[in-house]
Every structure is written in C-alpha cells, then in structure tokens.
Amino acid sequence: MSFISLSVRRSILAPRLRPTATLARAYTTAKVDIKALKKLRTLNPVAMSKAKEALLSCDNDITRALAWLEEDALKAGAKKADKVKDRVASEGAVSVFVNESLTAATIVELGCETDFVARNASFVDLAAEIAQAGMGFASTSAEGAVLAGIEAHDLAAKMLDGRTVSDTITETIGRLGENIVLRRAAVVGAPSAAESIVVSGYVHGSVKGSAGGSAGKIGGLVAVTSSIKSDAHRSTLSQLTRRLAQQVVGYGPRFTTMEEYQKAGEQAEAPDAVVLEEQQFLFGGGSVKEVLAKISKEIGAPVEILSFVRYERGEGVEKADKPDFAEEVRQQLA
C-alpha cells in the first residue's frame, strides 16, 4: 500500500481550494462605509444589519440605499398584509385636519387590531397624514362645501411623501405587524370660501405622534355659514365652531335641525337628545339654537350650521373574540 505525502496532498488540493478562497476574499473586500452607514440610519432608522445590507447592495450609495430600503419595506409589508388581511381591525384612531384659513377640514378613521398599535406614534402620524391628504378632495366653491364622503380607494391612491397612501399603509403593516384598514373619510368646506364658511374640529382622547400628528378615539367636524365681514367675526365663529365640534363629539347628535328630525319619521329618542340645535349647549347659554341666535345678533348676520360629522373608532365593526395570551403572541410572530 502506497502513501501520498502531506505536501503532495496539499499540492493536489490547492487548485480546488483557490476559487473558494478567491470568493471569500472578494466578499470581505466589500466593506460598508461607516459615514454612509451613520447618515443612512439618520435618514431611515432601520436595524443596523438592514442598513448594512442596503449599502452593500448599492455600493455605499446613500440615495440608492434609501430607495432599496423603501422597496424592501414595501415587499415585507405586502407579505405581512397578505397574512393578516382577514383579521378584524376593530380598534384604531380618528384624526381631523383643518386648514389654516378654517374654511375646509377632513376627518378619517384608520383601523387596526389593538389599542396598543392605535396609540403607537407611527400609527398616529399615519392617520394624521392621511387626513391631511384628504384635503385634495375639498370643494373648490362655497356651493359645494357641504359634507361629502371620500371613497377609501380614492384616498388610498393619493400621494403621501412620494408614495401612495395605500403603499404607506402596507409598509406600516410590515413594521407594526397588524392589519391596518382605511375605513372611512369625509371632507367639508371650501378653501376659497373665506367670506362665508368657518370650520373646526375636535378629537377626544387625542394621542400625539412623533412627527406632530394627533389622533384619538372620537372625532368631529362642524362647519357654519354666515356673512363674515371682519376678522372679529371670524374669531367669534371660530370659537363657536370649536365648541360645537366638542358638542358633537360629546353628545353624539344625529340631526342638525328639527326639520331633519321630522323628515326622518318616528324616532325613539327625544329631539333634545339627537338634534344638535335642540341640545343644551355644552358651554351654557341655552340650547344650541338659542346660542346661534345670540351670535347672529352679535355679529349682525345669520349664523347657520352647514353640516357636522362624528366618527368613533370601531363604530359598526363587530369585535372578534380576544385570543388567549399564547395565541396573541403567535399572531404577533406570524
């Protein structure tokens, strides 16, 4: 039996090992630029490993790496969204946005699965940003300034920081791990109607997001119409609409006037329970109708409630049975 010396064996094996060694050396020579890594994570605070992967895939080009991260997050979100799409989103948040001139406003309800996510800063900011995006549906004339619903699929197609609302929701699903649904939205007022409309909103149980947005459990909008002749008039009406929005959120009326109440037919509740003008004003001074009459006399022009809307999170959604702790953990890890 013959033996092959160690040196001979090495000479035979060496050619086979060289390709692997070459590949290893090529891999290790691809290094992440530390300055680029720091800047990338400042612009997009992802995990260190994900930031490194993005830079290695993009030759340390920060602009390309940012795009890579966005695409990666969207893919991860789409995958997660497909897994959780059948879960009931009975929690969530309501957010309102009122423009600076107080002539138009929007309200949205964004649904999620748990109160924990509903209070998450990213979720709150998303709801607030979507409400702002809804301003694109505001009427361009005072004649069309009445309350109008916004179709969820139309709002989902609106752009939000370079991406559609739909894609932003999908990416957020990937990060937060819950089903997120844009349930409903509405807009009232007209940005150009500064001489005839004042709008205000209010959110109860408001939570602040990290980017300055806010959202809560119940929200409301109120728009009044009048002949506005001065800044003092507008200031008076601004305070009125703000208080009326609080009234709507707190008392939950379903009609504006007695005429609307009577047209709806027989009602189980008394008018002063469900008709906004017949309710006692939350801040005193008689009924809402009486307060409107007093302010009309004060500014020398009739003041009327144009419209109002009230959203409560999870309204009309049947809540699923809460899973036991172990099942809840499994769902979060799915």
Task: Give residue spans per PLM region.
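N-terminal assembly/interaction segments in proteins that build large macromolecular machines
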Residues: S2-S5, L23, Y27-A334
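N-terminal chloroplast transit peptides
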Residues: M1-L17
